[in-house]
């Protein structure tokens, strides 16, 4: 074909059977103006052969089909016939668009989109472009129409102001549908029907409007496309129309970021025809109205103006707020006592602003009210601080009656103490006048008036006190509390404790925190509150008194309002009563009055959010934060706060802003000036989790706790981030408060100032909770002198050393409780810890002294037996308690892993914080990402792990790849244990450590500096090394274990344990020599026994002997340790075995013949390393093998011998042996090592003769596991190895496997490849049956697809059942072919395949096809088409720059061009599925013409048998 540059321009009309009438009209019109040379009528087949873009214009109708898709992919210029007709009629050029244009319905239209989801926006763009329009992402002057999904965006407001049409996406779809029917313009469709409604996407709620206005708003909202809701809903409501800036809806709307706008916004939007900008109609909270006029009368600097705004209780809407004289006000209110009949129904509760303690001491029962009236009365009682009862009891003081009730009359006739029975006017008038009104003038006429009996006299006195002074209604405390108020002025700030709120002490929980202990009648009255039959209703802060200090007027009014809604009481700063809480700003202020706790507004906000009373010491933000004024240490930091919400988050953002930091919501790595985003430098969060935390780790940005911010505020300097990383916070310290630190620089402005300031009493901050023993509370000279002599530190050091360990409050009484004038004060102190501190400290020589008593000797003997019979945790018992104590004093734990740099694998990301913390505590460093400085990589996985992370680390030399248990062992044993004992395959449930004693000696000798300790260790080491070679008799063991020293039972323990180690080492030595005899390497000079007899007994010598031994022996320690009987005499280890040189040579030949060149198992790899390291030069990281390797090793060395030379083995087991020439034996004699309950199953050679044929017995069973839980994998892997099988640990299918055990049939690579290769696909019950039989059994009954399995497993779907049946069908078919024809075939034998799929999936497809006997070509060039039989391609998953096969050319040459789904369906279905259903689109024309390509090609091939053809068709 000619080059596209030289090809002439022409117009090609693509002819097909589905052309419309416009196609012919366009062609006829073009013939009139174009020559025959430049106008062509072509077929689709000609377009499919086109390989590159040319200069021609292609006229297609419709825009579908293979030819259209091919041309579009090449980027050719494609238009529809309507475009040709329109351009000719209007004398316009055909558009040169980069995309196909079907018609010109939207010519001259430029659109932009806003508030659309991604899918809808892409559809709009597609339709506009295909109709000849233009699309802009941004809104500019050229845009003619805006397509909007809803109103309110910036694009919407600008377009509306520019009077551009704002339309819905349905307008574009309507144009497309009509343009397919006839040639139209966009103006032919009425746009008014598709204009975006004014309130589209708005969910409107109202508050404060009349019912008529509400209905009108509801009607107009629905008319203009909005949604009206009566309830304000979070994440649903978008606008709240408010009359005034108050009310519950308004507060919630502000919190939920809902637009709070006036009703004018609503009507202006309708009038102007588009939704107005909400910022122009925003309703802000009104400032507090001053109700007291400015006068010349001095009122005192600290006195607050009376904040009560006086309202009438009638329905008059315009209430005068002008201030009048108070006495005149009282008389004016008295003249309007009688409200209208429906006053209570229409009463606005918010207009009654009375003192919060107005009803203090009143216990009220409401009778005869319901509906809205009852709700309003409840709110009034709660706001006034009263206690409301739900049922009549003897504790009720006031009964407010609406309608008469017979039960009330009966109660009044029976009760001895009759309460006041009043009308509702008493309550309304009391609120209107600001103080309680006398009850006598409000008695209900239906009930007889009686006097209150004596138990209620305190309440009468309280009422009288309130009536006596109307100018100060808040000053109404009882007279007998004056002494306690006076005393409380001299107590230390913050020393008053919060009382226990447990029901048992509810008699002390009075409405204020001060109780009158001597007033028995009041206590009797209050005790009734604890009656379980009485239900008391109150808010969150019920019975709590507050003092608000240090806020602006607006903030203070807001806080007071919150208190009212939660039934709290706010005291004035001049009131002498002790408030429960003083609420101050976050940075604190001066608190002159005595209060129970000083808390911040953050505490208040979080209590409201969580709807419970929080402990002020549970969070550092709940108490004032020390702050160095004028310091901005974080001015160059950009902070992101995550995982904090509500008031806690606001407080942290506020504090960070004060420190100079920039706080932004999004956590980005690079700055984006257009969006106003800065590159983050710090992340502040609670826990080490979440997407932002992962990003911080990935970008190496510090993720710190909020304590870092507090430290920066405290010191005025930027604190070190490493000390406050969220990963370093222990679990038990995550909830600890940070407020109990006593270090306060003098330059810091303290947040609280008491009469005794903190600079003179640094322990004041630690007394929020009284601990059982606080050294600072012992003020006597005698105690202080003793303590100072003992500590040799200043007095405050003891208090400062324990401030971080905050102890729970004991809820003790304050001096105002127990310092009564008529009672004798008898203090009691808990001084047990103080007396213990006065004991004489132990001297340096006392650490090894023990007392010998008969009981201790009995314990010592029992301890020896327990240790000798234990096979676990030997490292924990080999070191005596004295040695452990000495190590703790001598060694510094922070230097155990010095010069070690760890990096934790991504697989252990959940444990990363914990592991990094352990490493840091042991002196190691850690890295978030693997780099050049890492020395230890913490990983957990299989031996031949296929993960990229493991491979990349393994390629690096000198890196220890260890298990997480290595760190745990170092921390537990307080020493650096060898890395070889904890490879990344280490499993504590399957690994038993017996070499910890040697390593303990090595570590102790390396680090110990104590002379006596060194001698002790050297003697122990000498004993252990002698025991290695079985040269120590019983007498020597007893002598070495400390004979004649009954006062040191630890030496006896060592002696008993040494016997155990002696037997184990002898057995290991025998196995080592057995393996050495079967190794094809030169003998090592350092392994002989003669070389050890005179060697120095040093730790280095012990280690070198280990390095010189076989690595297989080091691995066998795990599976052989449990076989040792620790009660056996040492002499029984001296075995006499006949040495057969011929047998040893034959075994050596057998080992060399059993090397599997095709096996991917761990054994061949590890054995090769072992041969390369024959000289003993290998690192400790390679000292250990996994259990799978051990099983493969034994399968290599033991199984053939058990089958071929069974009589020889039996003879060896029964014949005497000589100790100098040990013949390798597969297992030690049962006399020396009886297997009582071994954790590891016996080897297959010990089993009776299997009921298999000789061929089946010699056949090796190689298993792969799939779709099993991790614990099942571990369990079944161990079982297979115990039974003599081999487990292949690969993520993908291994052709060398013979069986695959599957949890559930899945359509994955392992299952399909096993099916294609005819392997045994078994249910897990097969392994359980083998476990019960202790051998491998026949497989037929446990195969997936067998009736026994399918009938037992009922929870499988049809696809899984089809997979199960297909596995058995292919296994029988392929095994039958092998038996009948002697040919090993697969399901795909004879296939020659070309693959063109995603590169990440191509290896899996290749392995699957090859497992079934197919030949897969590398690449997909054209010459391969002649030889190939199948082509599988998936272009949808290919990247644009990846090469693609020419499907049309391949199909033309008879290659079956199919989708990859055909492979799995071919295996699963009983009959091969029709290829036409899986044919690629570009190959369909050739399938119709030539038929099935495979049939034609295979008929001409002579190398394919009829049997293969019959399987394919």
Swiss-Prot record:
Question: Which SMART domains does this chain map to?
Answer: BRCT
The residues covered by the BRCT domain are 101-189, 194-283, 354-444, 538-611, 629-726, 892-984, 1253-1344, 1383-1480
- Keyword Hydrolase in record: no
**Which terms under GO biological process does the entry name?**
chromosome organization; DNA amplification; DNA damage response; DNA replication checkpoint signaling; DNA replication initiation; double-strand break repair via alternative nonhomologous end joining; double-strand break repair via homologous recombination; mitotic DNA replication checkpoint signaling
Region (Disordered) residue ranges read 289-308, 786-809, 1031-1053, 1086-1109
Q: Which UniProt keywords apply?
A: Cell cycle, Chromosome, Cytoplasm, Cytoskeleton, DNA damage, DNA repair, DNA replication, DNA-binding, Nucleus, Phosphoprotein, Repeat
InterPro entries assigned to the protein according to its UniProt record, in alphabetical order: BRCT_dom, BRCT_dom_sf, BRCT_TopBP1_rpt8, Secretoglobin_sf, TopBP1-like_BRCT0, TopBP1_BRCT_1
Q: What is known of its domains?
A: Some BRCT domains specifically recognize and bind phosphoserine/phosphothreonine marks on proteins. The N-terminal half is sufficient for DNA replication.
Per the similarity annotation, which family is this? Belongs to the TOPBP1 family.
Kindly provide the name given to this protein in its UniProt entry: DNA topoisomerase 2-binding protein 1-B
Origin organism is Xenopus laevis (African clawed frog)
**Which gene is annotated as encoding this protein in its UniProt record?**
topbp1-B
């Amino acid at each position: 074909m000619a080059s596209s540059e030289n090809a002439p321009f022409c117009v090609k009309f693509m002819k097909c059977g589905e052309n419309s009438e416009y196609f012919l009209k366009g062609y006829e019109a073009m013939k009139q103006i174009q020559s025959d040379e430049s106008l062509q009528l072509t077929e689709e087949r000609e377009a499919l052969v086109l390989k590159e873009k040319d200069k021609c214009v292609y006229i297609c109708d419709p825009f579908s089909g293979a030819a259209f898709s091919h041309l579009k992919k090449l980027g050719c210029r494609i238009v529809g016939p309507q475009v040709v007709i329109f351009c000719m009629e209007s004398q316009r050029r055909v558009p040169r668009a980069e995309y196909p244009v079907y018609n010109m319905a939207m010519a001259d239209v430029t659109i932009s989109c806003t508030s659309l989801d991604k899918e809808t926006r892409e559809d709009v763009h597609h339709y506009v472009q295909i109709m000849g329009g233009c699309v802009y992402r941004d809104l500019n002057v050229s845009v003619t129409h805006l397509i909007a999904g809803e109103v309110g965006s910036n694009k919407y407001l600008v377009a509306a102001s520019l009077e551009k049409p704002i339309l819905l996406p349905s307008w574009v779809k309507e144009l497309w549908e009509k343009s397919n029917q006839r040639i139209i313009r966009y103006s032919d469709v009425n746009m008014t029907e598709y204009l975006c409604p004014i309130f589209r996407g708005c969910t409107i709620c109202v508050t404060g409007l009349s019912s008529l206005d509400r209905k009108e708003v509801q009607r107009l909202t629905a008319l203009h496309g909005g949604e009206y809701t009566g309830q304000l809903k979070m994440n649903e409501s978008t606008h709240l129309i408010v009359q005034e800036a108050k009310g519950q809806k308004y507060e919630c709307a502000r919190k939920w970021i809902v637009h709070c706008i006036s009703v004018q916004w609503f009507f202006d939007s309708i009038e102007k025809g588009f939704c107005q900008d909400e910022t122009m109609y925003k309703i802000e909270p009104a400032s507090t109205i001053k109700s007291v006029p400015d006068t010349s009368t001095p009122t005192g600097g600290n006195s607050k103006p009376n904040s009560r705004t006086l309202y009438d209780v009638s329905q008059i809407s315009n209430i005068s707020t002008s201030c009048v004289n108070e006495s005149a006000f009282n008389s004016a209110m008295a003249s309007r006592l009688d409200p209208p009949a429906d006053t209570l129904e229409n009463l606005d509760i918010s207009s009654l602003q009375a003192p919060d303690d107005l009803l203090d001491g009143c216990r009220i029962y409401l009778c005869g009210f319901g509906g809205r009236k009852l709700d309003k009365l409840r709110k009034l009682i709660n706001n006034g601080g009263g206690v409301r009862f739900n049922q009549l009891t003897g504790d009720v003081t006031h009964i407010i009656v609406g309608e008469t009730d017979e039960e009330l009359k009966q109660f009044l006739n029976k009760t001895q103490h009759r309460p006041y029975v009043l009308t509702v006017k008493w309550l309304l008038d009391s609120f209107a006048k600001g103080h309680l009104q006398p009850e006598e003038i409000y008695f209900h006429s239906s009930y007889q008036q009686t006097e209150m009996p004596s138990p209620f006299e305190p309440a009468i006195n309280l009422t009288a006190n309130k009536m006596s002074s109307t100018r100060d209604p808040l000053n109404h405390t009882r007279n007998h509390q004056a002494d306690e108020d006076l005393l409380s002025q001299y107590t230390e700030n913050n020393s008053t404790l919060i009382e226990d709120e447990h029901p048992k002490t509810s008699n002390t929980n009075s409405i204020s925190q001060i109780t009158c202990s001597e007033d028995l009648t009041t206590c009797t009255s209050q005790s009734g509150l604890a009656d379980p039959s009485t239900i008391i209703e109150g808010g969150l802060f019920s019975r709590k008194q507050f003092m608000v200090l240090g806020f602006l007027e607006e903030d203070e009014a807001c806080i007071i309002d919150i208190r009212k809604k939660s039934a709290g009481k706010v005291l004035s700063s001049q009131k002498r009563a002790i408030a429960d809480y003083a609420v101050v700003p976050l940075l604190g202020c001066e608190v002159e009055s005595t209060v129970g706790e000083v808390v911040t507004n953050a505490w208040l906000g979080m209590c409201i959010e969580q709807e419970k009373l929080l402990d002020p010491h549970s969070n550092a933000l709940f108490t004032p934060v020390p702050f160095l004024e004028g310091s901005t240490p974080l001015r160059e930091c950009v902070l992101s706060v995550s995982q904090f919400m509500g008031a806690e988050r606001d407080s942290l953002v506020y504090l960070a802003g004060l420190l100079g930091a920039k706080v932004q919501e999004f956590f980005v790595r690079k700055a984006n000036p257009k969006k106003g985003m800065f590159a983050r430098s710090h992340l502040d969060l609670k826990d080490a989790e979440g997407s932002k935390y992962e990003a911080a780790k990935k970008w190496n940005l510090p993720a710190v706790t909020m304590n870092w911010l507090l430290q920066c505020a405290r010191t005025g300097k930027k604190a070190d981030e490493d000390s406050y990383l969220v990963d370093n916070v222990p679990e038990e310290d995550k909830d600890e408060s940070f407020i109990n630190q006593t270090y306060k620089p003098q330059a810091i402005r303290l947040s609280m100032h008491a009469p005794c300031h903190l600079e003179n009493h640094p322990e004041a901050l630690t007394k929020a909770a009284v601990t059982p023993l606080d050294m600072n509370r012992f003020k006597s000279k005698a105690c202080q002198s003793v303590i100072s002599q003992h500590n040799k530190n200043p007095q405050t050091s003891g208090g400062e050393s324990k401030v971080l360990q905050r102890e729970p409050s004991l809820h003790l009484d304050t001096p105002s409780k127990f310092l009564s004038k008529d009672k004798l004060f008898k203090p009691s102190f808990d001084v047990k810890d103080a007396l213990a501190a006065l004991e004489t400290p132990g001297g340096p020589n006392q650490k090894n002294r023990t007392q010998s008593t008969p009981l201790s000797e009995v314990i010592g003997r029992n301890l020896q037996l327990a240790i000798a019979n234990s096979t676990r945790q030997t490292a924990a018992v080999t070191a005596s308690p004295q040695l452990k104590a000495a190590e703790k004093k001598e060694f510094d734990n922070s230097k155990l892993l010095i010069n070690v740099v760890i990096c934790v694998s991504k697989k252990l990301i959940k444990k990363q914080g914990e592991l990094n913390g352990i490493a840091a505590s042991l002196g190691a460093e850690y890295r978030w990402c693997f780099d050049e400085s890492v020395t230890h990589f913490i990983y957990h996985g299989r031996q031949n792990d296929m993960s990229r992370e493991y491979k990349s680390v393994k390629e690096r030399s000198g890196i220890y790849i260890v298990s997480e248990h290595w760190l745990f062992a170092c921390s537990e044993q307080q020493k650096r244990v060898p890395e070889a004992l904890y490879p990344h395959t280490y499993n504590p449930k399957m690994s038993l450590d017996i070499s910890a004693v040697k390593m303990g000696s090595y570590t102790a000798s390396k680090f110990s500096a104590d002379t006596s300790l060194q001698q002790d260790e050297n003697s122990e080491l000498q004993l252990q090394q002698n025991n290695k070679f079985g040269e120590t008799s019983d007498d020597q063991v007893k002598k070495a274990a400390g004979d004649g020293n009954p006062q040191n039972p630890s030496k006896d323990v060592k002696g008993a344990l040494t016997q155990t180690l002696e037997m184990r080492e002898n057995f290991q030595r025998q196995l080592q020599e057995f393996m050495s005899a079967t190794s094809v390497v030169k003998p090592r000079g350092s392994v002989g026994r003669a070389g050890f007899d005179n060697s120095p007994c040093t730790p280095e010598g012990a280690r070198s002997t280990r390095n010189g031994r076989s690595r297989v022996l080091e691995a066998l320690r795990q599976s052989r340790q449990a076989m040792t009987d620790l009660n056996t005499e040492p002499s029984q280890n001296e075995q006499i075995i006949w040495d057969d040189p011929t047998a040893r040579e034959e075994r050596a030949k057998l080992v060399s013949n059993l090397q599997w060149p095709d096996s991917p198992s761990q054994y061949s790899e590890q054995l090769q390393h072992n041969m390369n390291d024959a000289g003993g030069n290998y690192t400790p990281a390679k000292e250990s093998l996994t259990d799978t390797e051990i099983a493969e090793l034994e399968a290599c060395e033991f199984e053939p011998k058990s089958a071929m030379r069974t009589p020889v083995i039996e003879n060896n087991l029964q014949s005497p042996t000589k100790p100098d020439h040990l013949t390798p034996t597969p297992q030690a004699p049962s006399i020396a090592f009886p297997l009582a309950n071994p954790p590891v199953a016996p080897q297959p050679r010990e089993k009776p003769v299997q009921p298999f044929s000789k061929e089946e017995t010699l056949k090796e069973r190689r298993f792969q596991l799939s779709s099993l839980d991790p614990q099942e994998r571990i369990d079944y892997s161990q079982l297979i190895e115990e039974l003599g099988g081999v487990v292949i640990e690969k993520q993908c299918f291994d052709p060398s496997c013979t069986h695959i055990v599957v949890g559930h049939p899945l359509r994955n690579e392992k299952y399909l490849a096993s099916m294609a290769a005819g392997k045994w696909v078994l249910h897990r019950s097969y392994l359980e049956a083998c476990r019960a039989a202790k051998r491998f059994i026949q497989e037929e009954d446990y195969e997936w697809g067998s009736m026994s399995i399918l009938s037992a497993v009922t929870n499988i779907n049809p696809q899984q059942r089809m997979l199960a049946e297909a596995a058995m069908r292919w296994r029988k078919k392929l095994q039958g072919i092998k038996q009948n024809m002697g040919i090993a075939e697969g399901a795909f034998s004879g296939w020659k395949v070309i693959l063109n799929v995603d590169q990440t999936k191509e290896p899996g497809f290749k392995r699957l096809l090859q497992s079934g006997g197919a030949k897969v070509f590398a690449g997909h060039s054209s010459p391969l088409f002649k030889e190939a039989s199948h082509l599988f391609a998936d272009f949808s998953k290919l990247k644009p720059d990846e090469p693609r096969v020419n499907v049309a050319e391949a199909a033309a040459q008879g290659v079956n061009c199919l989708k990859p789904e055909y492979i799995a369906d071919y295996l699963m279905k009983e009959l091969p599925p029709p290829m036409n259903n899986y044919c690629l689109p570009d190959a369909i024309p050739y399938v119709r013409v030539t038929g099935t390509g495979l049939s034609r090609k295979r008929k001409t091939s002579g190398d394919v048998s009829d049997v293969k053809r019959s399987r394919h068709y």
